[in-house]
Curated annotation (Swiss-Prot):
It is an enzyme of class 6 (ligase). Its EC number is 6.3.2.6. It comes from Maridesulfovibrio salexigens (strain ATCC 14822 / DSM 2638 / NCIMB 8403 / VKM B-1763). GO terms for molecular function: ATP binding; phosphoribosylaminoimidazolesuccinocarboxamide synthase activity. Gene3D superfamilies: ATP-grasp fold, B domain, Phosphorylase Kinase, domain 1. The keyword Nucleotide-binding applies. Pathway: Purine metabolism; IMP biosynthesis via de novo pathway; 5-amino-1-(5-phospho-D-ribosyl)imidazole-4-carboxamide from 5-amino-1-(5-phospho-D-ribosyl)imidazole-4-carboxylate: step 1/2. GO terms for biological process: 'de novo' IMP biosynthetic process. This is Phosphoribosylaminoimidazole-succinocarboxamide synthase.
Amino acid sequence: MSKHVVETDIKELKLLSRGKVRDIYEVDDDKLLLVTTDRISAYDVIMPNPIDDKGKILNQITLFWMDMFKDIIPNHLIASKVDDYPEVLHKYRDQLEGRSVLVKKAKPLPIECIVRGYITGSGWKDYQKTGEVCGHKLPEGLKESEMLEQPLFTPSTKAELGEHDENISVEKATEMLGKELFDKVQEATLSIYKRGRDYAREKGIIIADTKFEFGIYDGELIIIDEVLTPDSSRFWPVEGYEAGKSQPSFDKQFLRDWLTEINFNKQPPAPEVPEEIATKTRDKYMEAFTLLTESELDA
């Protein structure tokens, strides 16, 4: 059984933040160390026990996509192997190998860049009420989970840990970023999504929607954080897909279903996740990794 990492402890570096999944350290004025742990959250609440290998799976899916998209947009990556990190980090190999990246310290944009290729989730609820999704007027008669003719760029604010992001209009996002930067961000978001969506579909996965994060480094727009993972995206199996109903997913579905079953009130502290649910969840993440990358997980 693999050793899981719930929380890192790098004594020589300053811990900048411990999010729902990632621990972020400052290496120097120009570099950060991002560690993807095996923590899992549902409904914005972190569960007490981890999912084995989840951090490695998410980290390595992101590396796979960043490489695929580097001709569309540069990324923040400096190194992903502990041997290439500053020597002071080598003794923490157990906590870092396969699940961490050394990155450029970019200035993050103040918005989350969400793209919706299929109508589902909160977008479906809004459409039923208003015929719109985040200010985009859509044709009448769409079914739940139907593919949209063109993917929608629907930015949101960035909420603090435990809070919910809020959708904002394209006008508001343009105001926050300025027209030139907004246009670049929208174009990059849609280009990356379309390429990723088309590739994944051939491999048996529908990417229904996702969110990206961008930053500015040396005056240049770059992609940061995670890219097209089961945590930042809604993955559905191509097999059995049919518009007109909700779809099974490649992520925390087992966990969410179990929490619904036990009437979890969506407030911390969360209950201990049974081993069977944790194993099924790991298997789903692993299945997405294998289908997309067609490679073995780097231990």
